């Protein structure tokens, strides 16, 4: 029987499946951070249980770390306690930890791939909704809750029901300057923010194959934003070349044997999907969200939509509410919307290619008066690579702030946040009310688009910036 990639991955990891019961899956990698793990470790301690597979468990600090200092006290008492607990728990249970002073420290979904912890064919979980990022490697990766974190720590397994399958094919080639972020925003603009609910999505088509691994990570990172359980891209030579030589990747003959297996991780000819969505890459332009869910997205050259133009009464009401919160009027050109802050970072867009794209726009220009612009590398290695290439100097000379690695302004859990009423061009992944700070107004864009907003003071089409 022909199988989809998702079905192959799922079936290969079933430990036990009784009739009329939820299957038990084996988990190959468990990624841990400071926010969703303390209670899980407390649960182990209370029952006298060890971590079953510490060698398959990797921890880092990211969510509430300061991006201005490595001082553990910088972001308040709750952050300090969570980080201290992670240090204590990892030491007690034998889990490898990349703490604030470790050269590999960074956002968990940046750290995993760059260290070769993430490999094709694996099941990967983390107490974080954007674990879908790792699906870019042809791995089944999804976020879990704290009680599930404890279960995986204790058993290296997890009960999971089978999801429905969705194929999203982006046909043809994207135009120059169109990034994975634009592609995925255009996809969600078509499906809506709940279009993938109950599904695992496989992204395919020429435009997807053309993406680098970093682009594919951006794509899969945001599968959750259309309601999907996970996102997948089948592994290919791009994947194998990225993985080869990384710290935790197989070496020598083991790598060759692994690649031979990884090449089987493709959807079979004749396999069927529950849902199929198709887009034409050439029709995708630079995207900007205007509302408070990711389905509320338009081309940078469009006008803010009129709620009256929505036939669906629920969509109309949602648009009215979003415009009121965002402080926008229908009909005004998006390029006339001024911004207060710019955030380039997050598990969506903080890798070296993202920083290069932003630096290309920033080079020789200055951040507009009254705009605060932050560049937050996703990890220690990304920061070091950017500095080796001189990107930090480009940003600093242009008036951007060059920060330490962390989740930063993606979410209001540290010192980097919006004040009420402030408008931000952000490369992160969520734009709901208060995500970046109470009363903050978030517009999601690609790194180059964020840099363009920083230097012009408003949204601007990067294709017009010479």
Curated annotation (Swiss-Prot):
Q: Which pathway?
A: Amino-acid biosynthesis; L-leucine biosynthesis; L-leucine from 3-methyl-2-oxobutanoate: step 2/4
Q: Which Enzyme Commission numbers does its entry carry? A: 4.2.1.33
Catalytic activity, as annotated: (2R,3S)-3-isopropylmalate = (2S)-2-isopropylmalate
Q: Which GO terms describe its biological process?
A: L-leucine biosynthetic process
Residues annotated for [4Fe-4S] cluster binding in this entry: 347, 407, 410
Q: Which InterPro entries match?
A: 3-IsopropMal_deHydase_lsu, Acnase/IPM_dHydase_lsu_aba_1/3, Acoase/IPM_deHydtase_lsu_aba, Aconitase_4Fe-4S_BS, Aconitase_4Fe-4S_dom, IPM_dehydratase_rel_enz, IPMI_cat
**Keywords, A to Z?**
4Fe-4S, Amino-acid biosynthesis, Branched-chain amino acid biosynthesis, Iron, Iron-sulfur, Leucine biosynthesis, Lyase, Metal-binding
Entries under Pfam families matching the protein: Aconitase
Q: How is the cofactor bound, as the UniProt entry phrases it?
A: Binds 1 [4Fe-4S] cluster per subunit.
Cofactor names from the entry are: [4Fe-4S] cluster
Give one GO molecular function term: 4 iron, 4 sulfur cluster binding
Q: What does this protein do?
A: Catalyzes the isomerization between 2-isopropylmalate and 3-isopropylmalate, via the formation of 2-isopropylmaleate.
Q: How does it assemble?
A: Heterodimer of LeuC and LeuD.
Tell me which family the UniProt entry assigns to this protein. Answer: Belongs to the aconitase/IPM isomerase family. LeuC type 1 subfamily.
This chain belongs to which protein, by name? 3-isopropylmalate dehydratase large subunit
| Taxonomic source organism | Escherichia coli O139:H28 (strain E24377A / ETEC)
Q: In the record, what lineage is assigned to the organism producing the protein?
A: Bacteria, Pseudomonadati, Pseudomonadota, Gammaproteobacteria, Enterobacterales
Tell me the name of the encoding gene. leuC
